[in-house]
Amino acid sequence: MEQFRGTTILSVRRNGKVVIGGDGQVSMGSTIMKANARKVRRLYNGKVIAGFAGGTADAFTLFERFESKLEKHSGNLTRAAVELAKDWRTDRILRRLEALLTVADSKASLIITGLGDVIEPEQSLMAIGSGGSFAQAAAKALLENTKLSARKIVEKALTIAADICIYTNLNFTIEELDSES
């Protein structure tokens, strides 16, 4: 069976805000299966935002696990991310899950992978998925050359990615939090 694939998730932190946005397209092979999936959501009583790229069912499993880690560690994003990454890498069932997560709270932004990596991005910017590099390049240019808000940068960069990446569409879900940095 062919794998569900492709998406674009982008996070920007600027001027007291952190924003994560993603498109809504779910593709299987060359077929668009759904155009309005919600790949970005709030967790931990709205204090954390998270986005995923990869298998949808896998991502929901990981969101549930991550939220339970947040509960266990009193909302400590980094500790919860490290604990999820450890489980993801060592648990035989979780190891088969194919997804990447971006997570952010008021203090930190992280990418969590199934290889056990927890990556803190440079320059307050992170992107994952098939259109991630396009969105990241666009957002980097906008961060360096404009005074646009974090939300506007995410909107514009996702639009550029959707113009280039066939696995990314214009049905965006965008979540925003106040940020300390």
Curated annotation (Swiss-Prot):
Ubl conjugation: present as a keyword of the record? Answer: no
Q: One GO term of the cellular component aspect? A: proteasome core complex
Q: Its Enzyme Commission number?
A: 3.4.25.2
Q: Which domain of life is it from?
A: Bacteria
Q: Which reaction does it catalyse?
A: ATP-dependent cleavage of peptide bonds with broad specificity
Q: GO:BP terms for this protein?
A: proteolysis involved in protein catabolic process
Q: Which InterPro entries match?
A: ATP-dep_Prtase_HsIV_su, Ntn_hydrolases_N, Proteasome_sua/b, Proteasome_suB-type
- Name its cellular compartments: Cytoplasm
Catalytic residues (positions): 7
- What are the protein's GO molecular function terms? metal ion binding; threonine-type endopeptidase activity
Keywords (alphabetical) are: Allosteric enzyme, Cytoplasm, Hydrolase, Metal-binding, Protease, Sodium, Threonine protease
Enumerate the residues binding Na(+): 162, 165, 168
Activity regulation here? Allosterically activated by HslU binding.
Database matches in Pfam families? Proteasome
EC supergroup of this enzyme? hydrolase
The cross-references to NCBIfam families, in alphabetical order and at most eight, read: ATP_dep_HslV (TIGR03692), PRK05456.1 (NF003964)
Q: What does the subunit comment say?
A: A double ring-shaped homohexamer of HslV is capped on each side by a ring-shaped HslU homohexamer. The assembly of the HslU/HslV complex is dependent on binding of ATP.
Family membership, please give it: Belongs to the peptidase T1B family. HslV subfamily.
Known role: Protease subunit of a proteasome-like degradation complex believed to be a general protein degrading machinery.
Could you tell me what this protein is called? ATP-dependent protease subunit HslV
